[in-house]
Amino acid sequence: MKKRALLEISVETLAAALAAVRGGADRIELCENLSVGGVTPSIELMRQARARIKAPIFAMIRPRGGKFCYSPAEFQQMKQEIAMAKSNYMDGVVFGILTHQGLVDIHANAELVSLAKPLAVTFHRAFDELRDLEQGLEQVIATGATRILTSGGQPRVQDGLAQISRLLHRANGRMVILPGGGIRPGNLARVVRETQASEFHSGLGNLLPDEHGTHRGFEEGVRALVQLLEAESQNMEPATSANRTGQTI
C-alpha cells in the first residue's frame, strides 16, 4: 500500500496548532494574521509552538500583507526574522519575493535561502502571481528553495489542477510541488487524484474557535483531511518519478 500524502496545516494561534496536531497534521505552517494571507509569527508564538509541538513547524517570513516586492528595510527585516526562526528551532521557513516586474527575484530569494540553511524553504503563493508558472518554477529551483506552495495560478486550487499537474511533471523530483489554496474535505479527493502530489496544504478556511473557545471543529476538519488522504493512498497507483520527492519535512 502506498504511503499516504503529507498534510500541512496553516495556523495563526497556538491553540489552532495544537488542534491541528491532534487531528493528525504532519506539519504546521505557523503564521499570524491569516486574513491577509499570513505574516511572520511573533517570537513568543514560535517559542510556545516549539515547546508544545514535536511535528515539523515552518514559520512564515513575511513582514506585511500585500504585494510581494519589498523595500531594502523590509528585506533586512526578513533576514532578521529568518534568524529568529532558526534560533527558535523551526524546521523550515516560508517566503517569496518578486521583482517590480512580477518575476521571481532570484538573487534576493537565493540570499534568504542561503541564510536559512539548513532549514527547508517553501516559496509561498507569491508564485501564483507570476505570468509564466513554468518559467517561474525554473527560477525558484535556481534559488535553492525546497518546495513551492501553489494553487496553479488560480484563486482556488480546484481551478488550477491541470497547471499543478504540469508543474509536477516539469519539476520531475527537483522541487516539491505543494498544492494548496482552498483545500477542504469536499474537494481534497479530486485534488489528490488529479495531481498525485506527495504533499497537500490547507488552512480549512481558518475556522474560528467555537462558542466554548475550543478548536474542536478545526481538529475534526484536519482529521477528515487525514482520513481522506489515507483512503486515497489505498486507491492510488504508486507515484511516478515526477511525483516522488524523497523529502518529508
Predicted regions and their residues:
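Active-site-adjacent beta->alpha loops and helix N-cap segments on the catalytic face
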Residues: 15, 34-55, 73-76, 97-117, ...
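N-terminal pre-domain/capping segments
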Residues: 2-28, 33-40
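Active-site mouth loops of central-metabolism enzymes
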Residues: 2-12, 61-79, 98, 122-133
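Hydrophobic faces of well-ordered beta-strands that scaffold small-molecule active sites
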Residues: 5-9, 28-30, 57-61, 93-95, ...
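A structural motif
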Residues: 25, 54, 89-91, 118, ...
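Catalytic cores of alpha/beta
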Residues: 15-19, 69-81, 128-143, 167-169, ...
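Short, low-complexity, charge-dense intrinsically disordered segments
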Residues: 237-249
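Ordered, amphipathic secondary-structure segments that act as subunit-interaction surfaces
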Residues: 80-97, 104
